[in-house]
């Protein structure tokens, strides 16, 4: 019997946008099983990270509804993520190209790392900025803030 190819990615997946779906679809094309390790709240241990907007159970349900994802497991700490990687022994890890040359949890473990491109143009930050800009534009009393966000988005 041929061994199943298992891929995984990890993150908090707060606001699911088309870029995630493109990434999940591409990942699933190259494996038999695609697993997502879902970070409950990255802000709890790293103050530079934002607290997720969407509750964990809703993020879990959303990810499980995406047909390219076979399994979702929740973790809180980087130690728990490492334990999941060691337990499942995946063949491939999917990481965003922004991690090239950086250290990350489990970078000393066997899974081959495949970096994904952001050529699709989507990011959670961009999505949050777009929502904020639309909200501001609909409230003329804060026009200066809207103009600030527009300039910021043009620079990103």
Predicted regions and their residues:
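Nucleotidyltransferase catalytic core that binds NTPs
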Residues: 1-156
């Amino acid at each position: 019997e041929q061994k199943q190819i298992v891929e995984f990615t990890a993150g908090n997946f707060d606001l699911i946008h088309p870029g995630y779906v493109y990434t999940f679809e591409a990942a699933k094309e190259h494996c038999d099983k695609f697993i997502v390790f879902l970070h409950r709240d990255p802000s709890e241990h790293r103050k530079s990270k934002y607290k997720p907007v969407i509750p964990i159970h809703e993020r879990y349900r959303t990810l499980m509804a995406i047909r390219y994802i076979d399994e979702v497991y929740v973790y809180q700490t980087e130690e728990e993520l490492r334990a999941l990687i060691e337990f499942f022994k995946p063949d491939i890890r999917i990481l965003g190209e922004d991690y090239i040359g950086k250290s990350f949890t489990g970078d000393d473990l066997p899974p081959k790392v495949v970096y994904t491109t952001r050529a699709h143009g989507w990011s959670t930050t961009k999505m949050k900025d777009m929502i904020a800009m639309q909200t501001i534009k609909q409230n003329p009393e804060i026009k200066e803030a809207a103009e600030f966000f527009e300039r910021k988005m043009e620079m990103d």
